[in-house]
Amino acid sequence: MISTHKYLNLGDKFTSLVNPNFPENLTLELINTDLASQIGLDNDDLKNIQDFCCKEKNKDLKPFASAYAGHQFGQYVNQLGDGRGLLIGQSFAKDKVFDLFLKGSGITPFSRFGDGRAILKSSIREYIGAEAMHGLRIPTSRSLMFFSSSEKVQRDQFETAAMIIRTSKSHIRFGNFEYFYYKNDSENLKKLIDYCFDTYSEFTECDGSIKKLFSKIVDSTASMIASWQALGFCHGVMNTDNFNIFGETFDYG
């Protein structure tokens, strides 16, 4: 079952509701059925997502972009945010929560100079790369659905637009905390931390301790990177907007 994302309850300092602008002539090419069952989605849920993306029928979903900041290549950038993707909801399985994220669904308030599109070859790379990492038992986001389109977009050359539905335990990045910390907005920083405690059963053992939460995030991130090194994997863009709070390999490009 897909539920409205609880992150929306935090308010407009955290999120911006956005109507997706889907690429032209979207065609569903692939459903990761094993992943769907693991995160608590049935055939009706998958049909609802497909109808939403291809026919824009499902009005129950409330897509939104998240605000965050980040250090990029050593320099702090005070506002980044979801520039070409939207969170559309959450699913639940075995007391765990999973995010559902559209990648390549058009311009958002955080797009800056981008066109909000993902391209076919990078979307294929993300799908295959994430499944390979999962098969090697390295924590990672994964792709639930893969869509092709007929739309052409300008990069170094013209490319074909595509879209994926990405899943992960959370899309809360290090940069979400930085966004409020560097604004000296302690009230909303605390709201974000409380949201983590209230939403994720993985943090129950922290007993509301921010120090324990921080240590758990550090440990899971260090374990992930050690797994990368053991494999010989290089992420290539290790900015703080590309790390989430569960130490999952994230944002393949």
Regions found by a protein language model. Name each.
Residues K6-N9, G104-S105, S215:
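Short, flexible segments with low predicted structural confidence
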Residues N19-N21, D115-R117, K211-K212:
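Short, contiguous strand/loop micro-motifs
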Residues I217-W228:
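Phosphate/ATP-binding catalytic cores across multiple sugar-kinase/actin-like superfamilies
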